[in-house]
Amino acid sequence: MTKPLLEVSACYRSFQAGEQQLTVLKDINLSIARGEMVAIVGASGSGKSTLMNILGCLDKPSKGAYFIDGQDTSQMDVDELAKLRREHFGFIFQRYHLLGDLNAVGNVEVPAVYAGKDRLERRDRAESLLSRLGLGERLDHKPNQLSGGQQQRVSVARALMNGGDVILADEPTGALDSHSGEEMMRLLQELHREGHTIIIVTHDMHVAQHADRIIEIKDGVIISDEPNLASQTAVKAQVDMSLAKPSGATRVAAWDRYAEALKMALLAMSTHRLRTFLTMLGIIIGIASVVSVVALGEGSQREILKSISSMGTNTIDIRPGLGFGDRRSARVRTLTASDANALKNLPYVDSVTPSISSSVTVRLGNKAVTASVNGVGPEFFRVRGYELAQGQFWDDDSVDALAQDAVIDDNTRKQLFPDSTGAMGSVIGQVIFLGDLPVRIIGVTKPKESAFGNSDALNVWVPYTTVSGRMVGKKYLDGITVRLDESVPSNAAEQGIITLLKMRHGTQDFFTINTDTIRQNIEKTTATMTLLISAIAVISLVVGGIGVMNIMLVSVTERTREIGVRMAVGARQSDILRQFLIEAVLVCLCGGALGVALAYLIGVVFAQAGGSFQMIYSTTSIVAAFACSTLIGVLFGFLPARNAARLDPVEALARE
């Protein structure tokens, strides 16, 4: 005796309805041979559709066994059942269940995509099947552009796409007019003659009369199973239903499934443009905030460090006392020019400048202004980064000779010589009085901008020996500034300077100010502020991610029937998971791209508005923004995608 193709043994199917258990199928025993055309007839609620779902591997018996070509399906997992549906079964639904976003060819191709067929091969087969079914002129039409009969023929072509060894037709004429219904039945009989196993589920005995065997079911029990002698169709060939068909699990096939998921994600996004944009909005704002804050922090930090550099890079200032605010500092008189000379001999010191400061009245003719007179060494201007606009600086000979030469800043020039413009030839060589001391102007410095603002103070620089010997009459210094070699760590050099001066003074009666320490503190403060504000901006990203999850849950609910159709034609759980996960990630990636664009726009507006510094965008922050948006898509898209993948195909198909 020939082994049956499909065999159901002692099958029961029960459902939980509240606190009651409803048994829909009761002790079903049924076998269907390869190449048969069988009609299962019954009234609504008889259990015929439930039996069809079990036969088509959309459902499993609650009790009993179901064998396909001798293999027990009860031992198969969901993906193995999906493989059977994909490679051996084809479904024709009463409501067609076509995917509205795809055209006729696209709908027919879907089973082949999940089977891993080559793109050109599946396109040729889809077009060939549709042409054979009389839809050669409707290949690019979407379901809403086709009549009921045409949609049903697309459904038939889809069922045949991967071979359709077993065709399960659920009320195939239920939504068609009588003429289209007759055409459909003739088509099913033709497929039967070609060797396909046809199982028709119907409530209409007239439709059942087209089959070679009629099984009648009532209240979940088979009450009749008789051959239909009036319709015995000669079968021309047998369709091969070996369970060892190639699975299509190649790398190219996997990429094709990714491409299909990406295409469907783009279609879903374009169908609901406004909703998609509003979903992205939280991501856009969050990414723009993070990128802009990092750019602002980087820009402000660079500007501040530039200002610190303008005051002298890699320098250490030495002041009397134990710190700012030390009341005893005015009585400490131990810093001397010999200390400066000793420091100059250290191997890691580039240059040294002593300093003595005093505030005096500067007079020129009948003009008198209050200015800060700074007695410094010849290398002071190099240490502090001053540049000449006119004239020259003095040298060591001027220091030794207590020369009465002065360099003034641009503010002093404007106050004393308001009419000097251009080459300023009238300034160089002019004599001004510092108190009662006449000095000759030999140079004018260029204006010096700072992120802290341009000072209005008036500065006059003369040799420190001149201030000490001719103006204030003191032998000690107000401070010493040391410029370090660029290759030396400033902290180590600072300790060396402190050690030397402690040895010379016998105690530590001075303190140091390391500009590198200031720079490090500013960098730390800026980084902390950037992190704090970015953390606040991340909240927007989290809110945006919750919005993505919410909309994806809505999308899963809206597209439940689509998910059911895809499962019916053989989609694995991983295929459904991938499709919705890609959609969530794509929404977040697009939001990330728009967020980065918005951040750049903010930078342009900031520059046009006259910001005091430029926003500096880093590649790292942009890459991190995209990585963050992708991560949000994965994290917040996983739950909806998992829910979609875990849907029961029978329930999904029944959902309106």
UniProtKB/Swiss-Prot annotation:
Homodimer. Part of the tripartite efflux system MacAB-TolC, which is composed of an inner membrane transporter, MacB, a periplasmic membrane fusion protein, MacA, and an outer membrane component, TolC. The complex forms a large protein conduit and can translocate molecules across both the inner and outer membranes. Interacts with MacA. It is a multi-pass membrane protein. Keywords: Antibiotic resistance, ATP-binding, Cell inner membrane, Cell membrane, Membrane, Nucleotide-binding, Translocase, Transmembrane, Transmembrane helix, Transport. Its EC number is 7.6.2.-. It is found in: Cell inner membrane. Gene3D superfamilies: P-loop containing nucleotide triphosphate hydrolases. Its main location: membrane. The chain crosses the membrane at residues 277-297, 531-551, 586-606, 621-641. SUPFAM superfamilies: P-loop containing nucleoside triphosphate hydrolases. Part of the tripartite efflux system MacAB-TolC. MacB is a non-canonical ABC transporter that contains transmembrane domains (TMD), which form a pore in the inner membrane, and an ATP-binding domain (NBD), which is responsible for energy generation. Confers resistance against macrolides. It comes from Shewanella oneidensis (strain ATCC 700550 / JCM 31522 / CIP 106686 / LMG 19005 / NCIMB 14063 / MR-1). ATP binds at G42, A43, S44, G45, S46, G47, K48, S49. GO terms for biological process: response to antibiotic. Residues 6-244 form the ABC transporter domain. GO terms for cellular component: plasma membrane. It is an enzyme of class 7 (translocase). This is Macrolide export ATP-binding/permease protein MacB. The lineage of its organism: Bacteria, Pseudomonadati, Pseudomonadota, Gammaproteobacteria, Alteromonadales. GO terms for molecular function: ATP binding; ATP hydrolysis activity; transmembrane transporter activity. The gene is macB. InterPro entries: AAA+_ATPase (IPR003593), ABC3_permease_C (IPR003838), ABC_transporter-like_ATP-bd (IPR003439), ABC_transporter-like_CS (IPR017871), MacB-like_ATP-bd (IPR017911), MacB_PCD (IPR025857), Macrolide_Exporter_MacB (IPR050250), P-loop_NTPase (IPR027417). Belongs to the ABC transporter superfamily. Macrolide exporter (TC 3.A.1.122) family.
